[in-house]
From Swiss-Prot:
Its EC number is 2.8.1.10. It comes from Chlorobium phaeobacteroides (strain BS1). This is Thiazole synthase. One of its GO terms (cellular component) is cytoplasm. Homotetramer. Forms heterodimers with either ThiH or ThiS. It is found in: Cytoplasm. SUPFAM superfamilies: ThiG-like (SSF110399). Keywords: Cytoplasm, Schiff base, Thiamine biosynthesis, Transferase. 1-deoxy-D-xylulose 5-phosphate binds at G159, A185, G186, N207, S208. Belongs to the ThiG family. It catalyses: [ThiS sulfur-carrier protein]-C-terminal-Gly-aminoethanethioate + 2-iminoacetate + 1-deoxy-D-xylulose 5-phosphate = [ThiS sulfur-carrier protein]-C-terminal Gly-Gly + 2-[(2R,5Z)-2-carboxy-4-methylthiazol-5(2H)-ylidene]ethyl phosphate + 2 H2O + H(+). Pathway: Cofactor biosynthesis; thiamine diphosphate biosynthesis.
């Protein structure tokens, strides 16, 4: 696959992993390795200065070829997200920040207004900002305009496993964006990740579907293969749909004779 460029960074994998919900750290590390990912997201609250054995920042940073993308999960407004980003950069040394602002725990939908305000500040401060957003083409373009490194529209609600419920809006975002479009949240199966790539997404971020699988490393590998397949299919040129049948070979020419 072609390299993915986000800011000044390049990655060969188009699968990004979340690190929540895993039963234990060993399972998470095994899944990260099996996925071939090079970019993982981790919440600030997973940093533990006192107990380094339970500190995911250190655990993940020690893995070869892994770049950390801290996230602001838990922030309920722009001010909290900006503060979390500053602390995360100090602790991790990473310029990446995934802006997540979902103040209502009942549905965990991202707040578009607070997200925009936080992104405008953080992009101005030199962060590589990757916001988690509703599948809203207007918002996505506004975030591109203020300097975000990518946009991450949801496929469906966090952890719901409802797949690409917002596919139509994601297609519009892809069509209008000049920065990477990464589907985040709601993917349940590798086939859905493949479908996202066939649509033209730059990458996908997966957490729950891998973390809660009976065999997380095997599921991570399956997602990696699906992402590659979807990307290759899109690049190869997918057959257009037709409203009627089209013969794959001539229906009458075999009746013609020259003798």
């Amino acid at each position: 696959m072609d390299l993915v460029q986000i800011g000044s960074y390049t990655f060969s994998s188009r699968l990004i992993l979340g690190t929540g919900k895993f039963g234990n750290t060993a399972s998470m590390v095994d899944a990260v390795r099996a996925s071939g990912t090079e970019l993982v997201t981790v919440a600030l609250r997973r940093f533990n200065r006192e107990e380094t054995d339970h500190d995911l920042f250190t655990t993940l940073a020690d893995l070869d070829g892994i770049t950390l993308m801290p996230n602001t999960s838990g922030a309920s407004n722009a001010k909290e997200a900006v503060r979390a980003a500053h602390i995360s950069r100090e602790l991790s040394g990473s310029p990446f920040i995934k802006v997540e602002i979902h103040p209502n725990p009942q549905h965990l939908m991202p707040d578009p207004i607070e997200t925009y305000e936080a992104c405008k500040i953080l992009a101005g401060e030199g962060f590589l900002v990757m916001p988690y957003i509703p599948a809203d083409p207007v918002l996505a373009k506004r975030l591109e305009d203020v300097g975000c490194a990518s946009v991450m529209p949801l496929g469906s609600s966090i952890g719901s496993g409802q797949g690409l419920a917002t596919a139509g809006m994601i297609r519009l975002i892809i069509r209008e964006s000049t920065i990477p479009v990464i589907v985040d949240a709601g993917l349940r199966s590798p086939s859905e990740a493949c479908a996202a790539m066939e649509m033209g997404c730059t990458a996908v971020l997966v957490n729950s579907a891998i973390a809660v699988a009976q065999n997380p490393p095997e599921m991570a590998a399956a997602f990696a293969e699906a992402v590659q397949a979807g990307y290759r299919a899109k690049a190869a040129g997918i057959m257009p749909k037709s409203g009627s049948a089209i013969a794959t070979s001539p229906l009458t020419s075999f009746l013609d004779t020259t003798s």
